[in-house]
Amino acid sequence: MAPPEPLTALSRWYLYAIHGYFCEVMFTAAWDFVVNYNWKFPGVTSVWALFIYGTSILIVEKMYLYLKDKCNILIRCLIYTLWTYIWEFSTGLILRQFNACPWDYSQFDFDFMGLITLEYAIPWFCASFIMEQLVIRNTLRLRFDEHAEPGSPVMSTVSMANGHVKCN
């Protein structure tokens, strides 16, 4: 029997899109709590966030695979943060042409055209670290086994050792 296949790019894009969407909602809820002491935690985002995050993280995945043996994690996270600013500015500028940009940072002190702001540099850097270490690395480890029965574990051919899948 053939070994399980890695997830397709579309499947990984989907997971990255959902992850980004969720993080956006959680960040806006936390931000509103810190700024306005709003105990309701009303996290919000736009459906555009699915495309924006899914595509961006898939591109960062390619960067990770290229850079992981070439530079340390701090440099990689700096590169990912710069990419995030470029991507956020570009997608925001395109969406603004259709009056569809869901964010406006013009009230921030260090914004550029209301599309990006330096106040988010540290959160973006930290998010880059989490994205690489938890999301991308683990997503790349996921496998699709088309022969598995729905709901049944495959422990007869695979065992767990120290959190890693090990073929018998």
Curated annotation (Swiss-Prot):
It is a multi-pass membrane protein. It is found in: Membrane. The keyword Magnesium does not apply. Its main location: membrane. Residues 36-40, 94-109 are extracellular. One of its GO terms (cellular component) is membrane. The keyword Cytoplasm does not apply. PANTHER family: TRANSMEMBRANE PROTEIN 229 FAMILY MEMBER (PTHR31746), TRANSMEMBRANE PROTEIN 229B (PTHR31746:SF3). Belongs to the TMEM229 family. This is Transmembrane protein 229b. The gene is tmem229b.
